[in-house]
Amino acid sequence: MKTLIAAYSGVLRGERQAEADRSQRSHGGPALSREGSGRWGTGSSILSALQDLFSVTWLNRSKVEKQLQVISVLQWVLSFLVLGVACSAILMYIFCTDCWLIAVLYFTWLVFDWNTPKKGGRRSQWVRNWAVWRYFRDYFPIQLVKTHNLLTTRNYIFGYHPHGIMGLGAFCNFSTEATEVSKKFPGIRPYLATLAGNFRMPVLREYLMSGGICPVSRDTIDYLLSKNGSGNAIIIVVGGAAESLSSMPGKNAVTLRNRKGFVKLALRHGADLVPIYSFGENEVYKQVIFEEGSWGRWVQKKFQKYIGFAPCIFHGRGLFSSDTWGLVPYSKPITTVVGEPITIPKLEHPTQQDIDLYHTMYMEALVKLFDKHKTKFGLPETEVLEVN
């Protein structure tokens, strides 16, 4: 900026000198200085100043882009962690002020709108196409890989693995259009299923529904698979809170062996099962892992049992530097590979034998998907997917 001001000052001095020369000539005298304008300020000095100005660090385009990416990720992390509680507290505060009518109107609306999330919510293509999600995608970056076509005449249950700390790949790929899920799977409506408790939080519920996120409850899944036509894809992060407790960089493990409820739902509705593995999901946060039997793991399991989620002690990088700790995830590639659908028959009353059969088929398909693609995304041929 100082360079620009100096150049501008030079131009002014040059103009004043030129004006003095013209005045001197009009009175018959010689010009005071023919080199004045060239010496004091020219168009080239302005150009040089502008080049210097736009080369300064704070206006570097790539750095601005990177900071926008960091901010876009941080806003989602904060929304995930505190938006619901913060909005609840703000509304309660407003209720105690002269603006109490705003809180009353919203809570009245909430009563009438309470069951909307169970019916798929209010998807907004405008929100799903926000530019902020493209910055979110590019930060890691996140990529969605399609391996097979999906029929719009069928319904699907996608099993997403692993959970990671926040399921960032699941959110970006299926609750936004940043990776063009609607173009890669035309005619398929993705619904990312998450904890039902999130939809009891004011404002947060509206934010989640706008992205096509719904409660991971039997009522919701039954409705979407039986009363919402065809072409629905419900994404369930099968490992849930239990799987998040073992999330750490370098570890490829899923909690699946005793998770059979999603298979039973698929059989009851004749919805095809689609295994998904997200390479890199576990790499973006570091976590303190408590040993089995420790007080820390006991607390986590109690939270998981009674509240539905397990609190994790984790960290990423800082807002302004990757060398400090903070809530911003590390910039590691996340590649989500959507596998081949497993055709599931419709059985109104599936037996345990039926459930076990298709559950085994699903586990085998997931391991096969992992083995087929692992070397493409930086894992050695010897890497084995741990199924717990």
From Swiss-Prot:
InterPro entries: DAGAT. Disulfide bonds: none annotated. The keyword Acyltransferase applies. It is a multi-pass membrane protein. It catalyses: an acyl-CoA + a 1,2-diacyl-sn-glycerol = a triacyl-sn-glycerol + CoA; all-trans-retinol + an acyl-CoA = an all-trans-retinyl ester + CoA; 2-(9Z-octadecenoyl)-glycerol + (9Z)-octadecenoyl-CoA = 1,2-di-(9Z-octadecenoyl)-sn-glycerol + CoA; 1,2-di-(9Z-octadecenoyl)-sn-glycerol + (9Z)-octadecenoyl-CoA = 1,2,3-tri-(9Z-octadecenoyl)-glycerol + CoA. Its main location: endoplasmic reticulum. The chain crosses the membrane at residues 70-88, 93-112. Residues 16-40 are annotated as: Disordered. GO terms for cellular component: cytosol; endoplasmic reticulum; endoplasmic reticulum membrane; intracellular membrane-bounded organelle; lipid droplet; membrane; mitochondrion; perinuclear endoplasmic reticulum membrane. It holds the Pfam family DAGAT. It is found in: Endoplasmic reticulum membrane; Lipid droplet; Cytoplasm, Perinuclear region. Residues 1-69, 113-388 are cytoplasmic. Changing Y223H: Found in patients with Charcot-Marie-Tooth disease; uncertain significance. Its EC number is 2.3.1.20, 2.3.1.76. It comes from the Eukaryota. It is an enzyme of class 2 (transferase). GO terms for biological process: cellular response to oleic acid; cholesterol homeostasis; diacylglycerol biosynthetic process; diacylglycerol metabolic process; fat pad development; fatty acid homeostasis; glycerol metabolic process; intracellular triglyceride homeostasis. Predominantly expressed in liver and white adipose tissue. Expressed at lower level in mammary gland, testis and peripheral blood leukocytes. Expressed in sebaceous glands of normal skin but decreased psoriatic skin. GO terms for molecular function: 2-acylglycerol O-acyltransferase activity; diacylglycerol O-acyltransferase activity; protein homodimerization activity; retinol O-fatty-acyltransferase activity. Keywords: Acyltransferase, Cytoplasm, Endoplasmic reticulum, Glycerol metabolism, Lipid biosynthesis, Lipid droplet, Lipid metabolism, Membrane, Transferase, Transmembrane, Transmembrane helix. Belongs to the diacylglycerol acyltransferase family. This is Diacylglycerol O-acyltransferase 2. The gene is DGAT2.
